[in-house]
Amino acid sequence: MASVDVSQNTSDIHFSVSAADKVAELIKEEDNSNLNLRVSITGGGCSGFQYGFSFDEQINDDDTIIIQQCSDGKSSVKLLIDSMSYQYLHDAEIDYIKGIQGEQFVIRNPNAKTTCGCGSSFSIGDEDDL
């Protein structure tokens, strides 16, 4: 199992403090401190691949664990990414934004060659690009 601590800038995936704060808030609402945010890539969507977000208590052997400290400076949350999904997410940014269209988690993925209008589906072009 690979473990990466983003707070020390050792990962090529950026997990923002804003996203960590929102994850911590949602975990508190669920009243289960064992929850972690899992980001995954699956086949589907209008562009070929789609992002998935879920809470998971289980950490698998092939998961990369990214730990991000929250803005309070005291708590932190874990982001889990399986090995297949990780290859499509290198150099990506996982953020949480608030705007006129509402609040949402977003992934800014430089590996995505095309994206759909909703931002949850993408294609990568040639696998040689990874």
Curated annotation (Swiss-Prot):
Homodimer. PROSITE patterns: HESB (PS01152). Iron-sulfur cluster binds at C46, C116, C118. The keyword Transferase does not apply. One of its GO terms (molecular function) is 4 iron, 4 sulfur cluster binding. InterPro entries: FeS_biogenesis, FeS_cluster_insertion, FeS_cluster_insertion_CS, FeS_cluster_insertion_RrpA, HesB-like_dom_sf. Its cofactor is iron-sulfur cluster. This is Iron-sulfur cluster insertion protein ErpA. The gene is erpA. Binds 1 iron-sulfur cluster per subunit. Belongs to the HesB/IscA family. It comes from Legionella pneumophila (strain Corby). Gene3D superfamilies: HesB-like domain (2.60.300.12). Required for insertion of 4Fe-4S clusters for at least IspG. GO terms for biological process: iron-sulfur cluster assembly. Pfam families: Fe-S_biosyn.
